[in-house]
Amino acid sequence: MKNKKISGAEAVVHSLLNEGVDLIWGYPGGAIMPVYDEFYKFQDKLQHILARHEQGAIHAAQGYARSSGKVGVAIATSGPGATNLVTGIADAQIDSTPVVCITGQVASHLLGSDAFQETDIIGISMPVTKWNYQITKASEIPEIFAKAFYIAKSGRPGPVLIDITKDAQFELFDFKYSKCKGIRSYNPLPTISEDSIDNAANLINNAKKPLIVWGQGVILGNAEKEFKDFVEKSGIPAAWTILGLSALPTSHNLNVGMVGMHGNYGPNILTNKCDLLIAIGMRFDDRVTGDPKTYASQAKIIHLDIDPAEINKNIIADVPVIGDCKDSLKRITNKTEKKSHSKWISKFDDLMKIEFDKVIKSDLNPLKDGLTMGESIIAINEFTNGDAIIVTDVGQHQMVACRYANFVKSKSNITSGGLGTMGFALPAAMGAKMGALNREVVAVIGDGGYQMTIQELGTIFQLQIPVKIVILNNDFLGMVRQWQQLFFDKRYASTEMVNPDFVAIAKGYYLDSERVKDRKDLKPAIERMIKSKKPYVLEICVEKENNVFPMIPTGASVSDIRLN
């Protein structure tokens, strides 16, 4: 290839191969056809999976990135193909998922002329990407692709978009590729201040009622071991945000549950009673803090984060520790005294007993005839032994799955956290499975979100991707209905769903499928699903008004958490 000029389209393929990419998700079209022609020629080295919608492609790339730890890649044509990626790009941005999106564009001489399928995808995507760039000359391709992958995966990860004009795809040039090792003025790994390490360790060693709240930063930083070492040496109870779940085994004796709007009673209440809050790789999202004016106002706060922009953005930190948490946790642990906070931890146990009596018992062991979401998740646990990757959509089922799913390995909980994108789970699950072929992947989805990307059953069928799909069907947009019940006097405006026959639809895609309505049939059906080596769709008909508690009303203090 040294003495042979190649086209920009072929250069795209070689750039991807140089970055170790062997799988991409996409949907072809006119402005990206030269690249697709090269995919055909290189299909022995680079697998392209045809999604049924570009949103499915980007969510699949996200799921792949989250389960594998690699960069996900999605590709689409110009115009509507590119704009159909935007929701997934925004989702990846707020959840710090490393994806590279490639879009075709009209020829450079047509830019700005409102040509067929022309959109300014650079302008559209600028607010929701970590970086984007429009290529108009083939010679730019190697450098831009190298930068794109470096930016997507370095520091705080995120999405990058490369827009390539059609003429650049045809243009010939001498190809040479060098991986990017750094970019002037871009510092993804801030130097950790030794003073901040000392100050953090001093606060930790003198705290009487400390609480750790960890987020996805622990997982993104591959810092699970360092985090576990810190938790166990310090003896501090640790609670998780929804994206942090699975970094520490669910059964760990210092794992005290979930914080936030539908989190556990104990960690939410005791956030406002601790004397030290140690936030690790989390961003103090409003769903976690409730009213920021009252959030942990009595406590000293240590905030570990790789992104300086998150420090003091929502909650003021007494000791910010900016940098890679894998390194900072190791250094803090070295200076942390080994302790046990048994008296303090007993308060979490006491509050968990209250939550069990008022919420969990009826969720998991209901006296009523109808199935609940909670008992469905517990039944899935029984047959996966906590070893599966659980991919959830958005809504009540998401909160219930996160509350009751059992995890023993990291990178096992995949969901749309910050953006709350309905329709995420089905395509993300097929991506997660392709990124972790040796692991069971179970998608847990509500009947509303399922129908937003239901067409990806076609992708699952065509590739025979052996994901297990559980639809928790309550014939409602459940989370919205719950709010209408609690705050709008049961005025159920546009939330009742008249659903199709989900089993028949799955069978129309030639997928194994069944429906469960009775408790006696639940576990046998889940066992059949998990034992199957093929894709499987299981519809579980649950109570129509099965609400999710605890709950912190929007804008209220975490101390105002409701149990009913």
Q: What does each model-found stretch correspond to?
A:
Residues 27-29, 48-59, 74-81, 136-137, ...:
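Active-site nucleophile and cofactor-binding loops and adjacent substrate-binding regions
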Residues 2-340, 379, 383-386, 466-471, ...:
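N-terminal alpha/beta PP-like core and its mobile active-site loop of ThDP/TPP-dependent enzymes
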